[in-house]
Amino acid sequence: MNARRRKHWGWGFEDEQPSPEEVRAAAGGLATHLGFPPVEVEDPVSLEAVRLPAPRVVAPAELAGICAADVHVRASHALGKSYSDVVLGFRGHFEHPPDFVASPRDERDVERLLEWCAAERVAAIPYGGGTSVVGGVQPVVDSNYNGAISIDLAGLRQVVEVDEVSRAARIQGGATGPDLEAQLAEHGLTLRHFPQSFELSTLGGWIATRAAGHFATVWTHIEDFVESVRAIAPTGAWESRRLPGSGAGPSPDRLLVGSEGTLGVITEAWVRVQPRPTHRASVGVRFPTFAIGAECVRALSQSGLHPSNCRLIDPAEARFTMSGDGTFALLVLGFESCDHPVGLSMDRALAICAEHGGLAGGRRESSEGRDRSRGGVGAGGGGTGVGGPKKGDAPPARAGTTETSDAGGGIGAWREAFLRAPYVRDIFVAMGVLSETFETAITWDRFPGFHERVIAAARAAAEDTSGAAHVSCRFTHVYPDGPAPYYTVLAPAQRGEEVEQWAAIKAAVSEVIVAEGATITHHHAVGRDHRPWYDRQRPDPFAAALRGAKAAVDPQAVMNPGVLVDPLS
């Protein structure tokens, strides 16, 4: 386990929690900014006041040394990090904690744990960073199981081997973003996969959930970096061959990527790495409307330029994040390379933006440590320099990396808001604001009508349950055939009814997303929360094949039951 203790609810560590006074000050400012009525800020239920159900099973003697069942460890592994999870944890409601938490030191420990779980009919929940926002790590099981445990991979966090010739690294599944980046930096390399959860999430978790990261185009998901995967299932270990590419039948890698802990515990993977970029160019571009900006982004995505950053923020989100005054959409545009200057690519991209009525400002270029900045964009959001991440263009400063970006102006403000989002969400819960996000992908030809209907459904559902709503959208990733829009819904919460409000909004918007032919998730995964809509999205024969694969590697159905497929009775 980590030396620093995680909060038993919400995001982050115990030693970085804001004081009650700081929470109240932040809450007052947020309520005013959103235009929501002020409410009394509540304090979370302390760990000392938490009461958990008694464990149903205890660790066997031969594994007792790597297992713990104290209140903190059970509570902190009972929930993920969705809005509903944070609300439940905030109020001290941990109805389904794991019976104990196991922290394997090596693969043999994982094997022994799964052997015991299969023999005793105990559910095994792989746990990386616990950052799931879709109900992916809850140890919720029915009476067909004698209990449930969490298997915390924090003890498997090393970069084991680096192949500098092939530019690949063998990394254990429990390595967090900061863990692996710090170790790769010793070799002058980087994975450059920076999801918003980078600080706490793990390589194994990224692979299990098909996480998306730094690059807005081309290499959008973790699977684009996966060379091979190794997992331990109840029936034994399985590992794919290291290959740059293969046409030999269905891919074993792709079966494990996105398996969400149902087919085994991902203990390590070979991933493609690269030198840190030495050439960058970035700029902010304003558009009078989100629709006009979307047309420009479509042109950029189909141009063959492949910008590393191409994220469009609508006026509502720009205003909320203080990167704009609400009168324009903002495009965060950037290029990077470890080999050559990227100014010419930026020149052509800006020409495309100009053809669509975009107004650029705050262009910045750097090559091998030499920065060159030009111009700025003034009113309603200041100058623009490019910031980082959406599902991570640059990791949080606390992550221990050395890369920086221009934090001034509109895009800098948006970047900082992005990095603070998980912490702000905890404050939302304390101040009585409901917060939910919907991320999806759809083809360009259907996007305009789809966007209108999703916005309308989100606003109607939030206003129906809360009386007011703040709904915004941004593109997290873009493809030649369509965007990946990401919708945020904020609304006043009714104390004591937050989870019911959240569920009503979740269902209303998810229904529209699936009915319109979009995906229920682009990068948050399925978990338990998205199961009803995922079941409708996937073909029935594929569902049957997936059940067959699970039966082959997990015949007792102990691996994360209820996720992706129904548990066996």
Predicted regions: what they are:
Residues 530-569:
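Activity-critical C-terminal alpha-helical subdomain
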